[in-house]
Swiss-Prot record:
GO biological process per UniProt: biotin biosynthetic process
Assembly and interaction partners: Homodimer.
Gene name, Swiss-Prot/TrEMBL: bioF
Organism, as annotated: Citrobacter koseri (strain ATCC BAA-895 / CDC 4225-83 / SGSC4696)
Protein name, as recorded: 8-amino-7-oxononanoate synthase
Modified sites of kind N6-(pyridoxal phosphate)lysine: 236
Sites where the protein binds pyridoxal 5'-phosphate: 108-109, 179, 207, 233
Pathway terms, separated by semicolons: Cofactor biosynthesis; biotin biosynthesis
Gene3D superfamilies: Aspartate Aminotransferase, domain 1, Type I PLP-dependent aspartate aminotransferase-like (Major domain)
Phylogenetic classification of the source organism: Bacteria, Pseudomonadati, Pseudomonadota, Gammaproteobacteria, Enterobacterales
Length: 384
C-alpha cells in the first residue's frame, strides 16, 4: 500500500460512515449570531458561554497589551517569553482558585498532554473516566503508564480499578463538566476514592470554570473539592483561549523542569495574558454573576420547553445540551435542517462520541435572548 492509498482509504472509510469532518469559513463565529456566506444564523455551537469574546473591557485590555508588549511573546517562558503580564495572571488565578501556583499553557490540549507526559512513568497507572476528553486519553495512551478506564461517573468502579496492585503511582483523571454530554462528575466521591488509595486526582474543568460556582470558580469549588491537579481553559467561559494548570509549589517547580510542552513552546502573547486578566475581573464581578444567572435561566427555559419525544435529551444542566439521535446520517440531516431554518447547530459523530450516539451538540450562551431559545425549540419541534 502506498502513502496515497493509505490516506484515500482512511478518508473513504470516514465518508462511508457519514463521519467525515468539515470546516466552514465564517465571518463571525462567536456570540449570539454566526455569519457565513453572507447569511446570519442564531449560533448554538459556540463555547463562548458568558459572551465575553466581544466584551469591550477585554478587547481594550488586549489592545493595550499589544501596544505595550507587542503582538507576540518572543520565545519560551524559559528564555524571554515570560512577562509581567503572564506573572500577574498566574498569581491572580492561583489566588482565585486557592492554589499555591498556576502555570499558563497555550491550549487546554497542551496542558493536559504536558502534565500527564511529565508525571507518569512505566510502573504508574492512569485511571480515567471513559468519556474523558481526547487530549487526556491520548496523553494517557502515549505515556509509558498503564491506562485503565472506569465506567462514566462511577466511583465504585474507579475504586475497584485503583485497588488492583500497582508498582508505581496512580493518577485519576476526569472532567468537571463533560464536553459532549454536558453532565458533571461526582467529584467529591471520586476524590475520596482516590485519596483513600493514595492516588492523585486531575480534573479538567474546561467547561465549568467561569460558568459555575461562587465567582465562577468552577465545578471543583462548587463541590468543595481541591484536586491535586486542576486544569482550567480560557476558550469557553473566559471567551479568549489558552489554559492553566493549578497545583502545589513543588509540582509547579517540577513541571517547569519536565513539562516539555511548556519548555519548548513559545508562550502566549503577553497581550493575551492581559486580556485574560481583564476577563477574570469580569467573571469575578457582579456583572459576571449576572451573566451566569442569565445563562442559567436560558438553560432552564430550553430544558423546560424541549419536546424530547424524538430525541434523547442528555441529563445536563450546563450550557452544553446534547440531543442524542443515534444515527450519523440522521444527525447530519437534522443539523442541515436546523441551518436551513436559521439555527447553526453542529452534528457530533463517532469517533468523537461512542458509536450509536451521534448527536446535535447545542450550546447556549449568555449572549442569547429568550426569543432565541423559543425559536430553537420551534425549529426542533418541526425537525423532529
Amino acid at each position: 500500500m502506498t502513502w496515497q492509498q493509505k490516506i484515500d482509504d482512511a478518508l473513504t472509510a470516514r465518508r462511508s460512515a457519514d463521519a467525515l469532518r468539515r470546516r466552514y469559513a465564517v465571518t463571525q463565529g462567536a456570540g449570539r449570531w454566526l455569519v457565513a456566506n453572507e447569511r446570519q444564523y442564531l449560533n448554538f455551537s459556540s463555547n463562548d458561554y458568558l459572551g465575553l469574546s466581544h466584551h469591550p473591557q477585554i478587547i481594550r485590555a488586549w489592545q493595550q497589551g499589544a501596544e505595550r508588549f507587542g503582538v507576540g511573546s518572543g520565545g519560551s517562558g524559559h528564555v524571554s517569553g515570560y512577562s509581567v503580564a503572564h506573572q500577574a495572571l498566574e498569581e491572580a488565578l492561583a489566588g482565585w482558585l486557592g492554589y499555591s501556583r498556576a502555570l499558563l499553557f497555550i491550549s487546554g490540549f497542551a496542558a493536559n498532554q504536558a502534565v500527564i507526559a511529565a508525571l507518569m512513568a512505566k510502573d504508574d497507572r492512569i485511571v480515567a473516566d471513559r468519556l474523558s476528553h481526547a487530549s487526556l486519553l491520548e496523553a494517557a495512551n502515549l505515556s509509558p503508564a498503564t491506562l485503565r478506564r472506569f465506567t462514566h461517573n462511577d466511583p465504585q468502579h474507579l475504586a475497584r480499578l485503583l485497588d488492583a496492585p500497582c508498582g508505581g503511582q496512580q493518577l485519576v483523571v476526569t472532567e468537571g463538566i463533560f464536553s459532549m454530554d454536558g453532565d458533571g462528575a461526582p467529584l467529591a466521591e471520586i476524590h475520596r476514592a482516590a485519596r483513600q488509595r493514595n492516588a492523585w486526582l486531575l480534573v479538567d474543568d474546561a467547561h465549568g470554570i467561569g460558568v459555575t460556582g461562587d465567582e465562577g470558580r468552577g465545578s471543583c469549588w462548587r463541590q468543595q473539592v481541591k484536586p491535586e491537579l486542576l486544569i482550567v481553559t480560557f476558550g469557553k467561559g473566559f471567551g479568549v483561549s489558552g489554559a492553566a494548570i493549578l497545583c502545589s509549589e513543588s509540582v509547579a517547580d517540577y513541571l517547569l523542569q519536565f513539562a516539555r510542552h511548556l519548555i519548548y513552546s513559545t508562550s502566549m502573547p503577553p497581550a493575551q495574558a492581559q486580556a485574560l486578566s481583564a476577563a477574570l475581573a469580569v467573571i469575578r464581578s457582579p456583572e459576571g454573576a449576572d451573566r451566569r444567572e442569565k445563562l442559567a435561566a436560558l438553560i432552564q427555559r430550553f430544558r423546560s420547553g424541549v419536546k424530547a419525544s424524538d430525541f434523547t435529551l442528555a441529563n445536563s444542566h450546563s450550557a452544553i445540551q446534547p440531543l442524542i439521535v443515534g444515527d450519523n446520517a440522521r444527525a447530519l440531516r437534522l443539523a442541515d435542517t436546523l441551518r436551513e431554518q436559521g439555527c447553526w447547530v453542529s452534528a457530533i459523530r463517532p469517533p468523537t462520541v461512542p458509536a450509536g450516539t451521534a448527536r446535535l451538540r447545542l450550546t447556549l450562551t449568555q449572549a442569547h435572548e429568550a426569543q432565541d431559545i423559543d425559536r430553537l425549540l420551534e425549529v426542533l419541534d418541526g425537525a423532529g
